[in-house]
Amino acid sequence: MKCPYCHHLESKVVDSRYTKEHTSIRRRRECLNCGERFTTYERIEDIPLMVIKRNGQREFFDRNKLLTGIMKSCEKRPIPQEKIEQVVDDIEKELNNKMKQEIASTEIGEMVMERLKDIDEVAYVRFASVYRQFKDVNKFKQELERLLQED
């Protein structure tokens, strides 16, 4: 690591610690030439996740967009905000764990529906009606019947 004082290219690590969030490592280094100490940080490089929309367009994953969609489905339902945030956190974590650079919006939609079904059936049906693009009452009825059969 290049010393910021004398620009020598060699240094030694004298102390390493995780940051509070455990997202990076703080290292204290000592220059082998001038003896000055300096701090560096090491972290994993984030790979932006691209969402492939139904029409083939690609856009960056937007956590707030996911949160807004779920909140609309849960509107006027007895679901605490913390629970909704937890659902979004879980989905975001699962997406990151997949280690993919691209993911289909349909896959994200299925993840949301899977979680909403366990939390609140009304919120689930609301989300499904938009996500699955119900065109008429019969599609809505079919989804309700499918939900009732699973119980």
From Swiss-Prot:
Residues 49-139 form the ATP-cone domain. The keyword Glycosyltransferase does not apply. Keywords: ATP-binding, DNA-binding, Metal-binding, Nucleotide-binding, Repressor, Transcription, Transcription regulation, Zinc, Zinc-finger. A zinc finger (unnamed) spans 3-34. Its cofactor is Zn(2+). Binds 1 zinc ion. GO terms for molecular function: ATP binding; DNA binding; zinc ion binding. Signal peptide: none annotated. InterPro entries: ATP-cone_dom (IPR005144), NrdR-like_N (IPR055173), RNR_NrdR-like (IPR003796). PANTHER family: TRANSCRIPTIONAL REPRESSOR NRDR (PTHR30455:SF2). Negatively regulates transcription of bacterial ribonucleotide reductase nrd genes and operons by binding to NrdR-boxes. This is Transcriptional repressor NrdR. It comes from Halothermothrix orenii (strain H 168 / OCM 544 / DSM 9562).
